[in-house]
Design a protein with these regions (language model features):
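N-terminal secretory/targeting leader peptides
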Residues: 2-3, 9-19, 26-122, 132-133, ...
Length: 361
């Protein structure tokens, strides 16, 4: 099967190189698309959102646009979806673009970076701060048109099989952590691994890894992480608001009508709002279950660790920006917007939450 998949990708790449124009399958006026997801079909949030997005697009188009969702490892492996769509072997993907940072380090900024923009701030930058134009510029290099499609909000710091209180506690720790957050941990001496969502629980249970972040209480409980690790840390410094993308083959996108593109854009933006609202509501319910489990200890990373995370995060982001001119351009725009929302936030949301806590104590 792996050999066949490689052949499919190689064949699609050859077609693209020869100038072939990807086009949806059309039957009786219905355009059919293959959407490959980086997530298991039933995984709460990321997996279920892909299905819901496909249903929304079908409903909004009166059935004229039909997306068939292929969950992770069915048509292609989870981390191969970008290449599949780029080459034309699939039409669209649903994935966190940090997974594909080796294509361009700039992709990190359109998903989530340590101590970066929160979910609503990221939406503001992409929609009204110049982020979408930069994202289009980055992904166009790979024949991709990107759209925001999901946000799971602030992440948790992860599940551990022991307490961590000092930077030394991270030395030698086998930790499942994505992308730029992983680089922060490497500099603290951790051994960082990349593990697909459906393999995390087994890896923790077997002792192959000592700790793992994933998302938050809702999907973490569904995966069974609370059954195989006792210590649940917050906050997730590495992902303050994680965005997943709907990536569309660019040549295919350009061949759609204005109406069809508007339907897909509107459905994707609606799914961002819906997914974030759902994550907040379901995390509340799942957190109650975790608090009721006397074995699970929910702990905050102490101030000393947070300072170390912050210092190393600044270094990692600056070094990432220096990788190439386009990434520097994205970084400069992102950081300028971050400075602005932090300034405004001190007078608005941060102030409101602080005073609300005081008023309702």
């Amino acid at each position: 099967m792996k050999t066949r998949r490689r052949n499919v990708l190689l064949g699609a790449t050859a077609i693209a190189a020869a100038g072939g124009l990807p086009a949806p399958a059309i039957a009786q006026g219905v355009k059919e698309f293959k959407l490959v997801s980086a997530y298991p079909r039933d995984l709460p949030g990321t997996g279920t959102s892909a299905e819901r997005l496909a249903q929304s697009i079908a409903a909004m188009s009166d059935g004229r646009l039909k997306l068939t969702v292929y969950p992770a490892n069915s048509l292609v492996r989870a981390f191969e979806v970008f290449d599949a769509v780029s080459a034309g072997a699939a039409d669209m993907y649903f994935a966190d673009e940090k997974y594909f940072r080796e294509k361009s380090p700039a992709l990190n900024f359109f998903a989530s970076v340590p101590y970066g923009l929160t979910a609503d701030e990221l939406c503001s930058w992409i929609l009204f701060g110049g982020g979408q134009a930069l994202w289009d510029e980055v992904d166009a290099q790979f024949n991709i048109k990107p759209l925001m499609a999901l946000n799971t909000g602030v992440q948790m710091g992860g599940w551990f099989n022991k307490e961590v209180n000092t930077p030394e506690d991270f030395k030698g720790l086998r930790y499942r952590m994505p992308e730029l957050g992983a680089e922060v941990l490497r500099r603290m001496g951790a051994t960082v691994v990349t593990t697909p969502a459906d393999e995390i629980t087994g890896a923790l249970k077997s002792g192959a890894i000592d700790a793992s972040e994933y998302v938050g209480p809702w999907p973490d409980v569904w995966l069974g992480l609370s059954k195989v690790a006792d210590y649940y840390y917050y906050p997730g410094f590495h992902e303050p608001g994680d965005n997943s993308a709907l990536g569309i083959n660019k040549k295919l996108w350009e061949g759609l009508t204005t109406s069809e593109r508007a339907i897909i854009e509107t459905a994707a933006q609606a799914e961002v709002t819906r997914s974030l609202a759902e994550a907040n509501a379901e995390n509340i319910r799942a957190l109650k279950l975790l608090r009721a489990d006397t074995r699970v200890k929910i702990l905050r990373f102490n101030d000393d660790l947070i300072r170390v995370f912050g210092k190393l995060s600044k270094e990692v982001l600056a070094e990432t920006a220096a990788r190439d001119p386009l990434t520097r351009k994205v970084y400069d725009s992102y950081m300028a917007f971050l400075a602005g929302v932090m300034d405004w936030g001190e007078l608005s949301e941060t102030s409101d939450r602080d005073t609300r806590r005081l008023a309702l104590a």
